[in-house]
Amino acid sequence: MKAQGFVHKYGDNVDTDVIIPARYLNTADHKELANHCMEDIDKDFVAKVKEGDIMVGGWNFGCGSSREHAPIAIKASGISCIIAKSFARIFYRNAINIGLAIIESEEVAQSLENGDEVAIDFDKGIITNCKNNQQFSTTPFPPFIQEIINANGYLNWISKQKANA
């Protein structure tokens, strides 16, 4: 599994209320959620983001209310992976459950800047900053996590398991 895109970088303690404000929680429409992703801290995010781009955060990314809407909004906006110094645990689980790749690495999150082009090889745990060819090593996802992400989420993965049983 691989991803490549441009960096959209944010700071520490980006909470779920900022990722998708509560005023939009009355919809389950993924495109509608994507249209409002990050609007309270980056009003141009939706216009800037392209399919495959990478979001980078600081410490405690995804803190706050436990809402699956937050990783759904990020994924539906076109983001292929989030790299952060650390994640709120419930956000981490919700992201994996909906098939959004996330990588926890202080070194990588610190080194990448807005606009850097990044290539990620999830199978090998290699992240490359294409701007300066700097490479970083991370721990690859365990096989079952890769399967969940490849299946586009936990529910799809379960359906595949049932179909193959």
From Swiss-Prot:
GO terms for molecular function: 3-isopropylmalate dehydratase activity. The lineage of its organism: Bacteria, Pseudomonadati, Campylobacterota, Epsilonproteobacteria, Campylobacterales. GO terms for biological process: L-leucine biosynthetic process. This is 3-isopropylmalate dehydratase small subunit. Disulfide bonds: none annotated. HAMAP family: LeuD_type2. Pfam families: Aconitase_C (PF00694). The keyword rRNA-binding does not apply. Belongs to the LeuD family. LeuD type 2 subfamily. InterPro entries: Aconitase/3IPM_dehydase_swvl (IPR015928), AconitaseA/IPMdHydase_ssu_swvl (IPR000573), IPMI_Swivel (IPR033940), LeuD (IPR050075), LeuD/DmdB_bac (IPR011824), LeuD_type2/HacB/DmdB (IPR011827). Keywords: Amino-acid biosynthesis, Branched-chain amino acid biosynthesis, Leucine biosynthesis, Lyase. It comes from Helicobacter hepaticus (strain ATCC 51449 / 3B1). Pathway: Amino-acid biosynthesis; L-leucine biosynthesis; L-leucine from 3-methyl-2-oxobutanoate: step 2/4. It catalyses: (2R,3S)-3-isopropylmalate = (2S)-2-isopropylmalate. Catalyzes the isomerization between 2-isopropylmalate and 3-isopropylmalate, via the formation of 2-isopropylmaleate. NCBIfam families: leud, LEUD_arch. Its EC number is 4.2.1.33. Heterodimer of LeuC and LeuD.
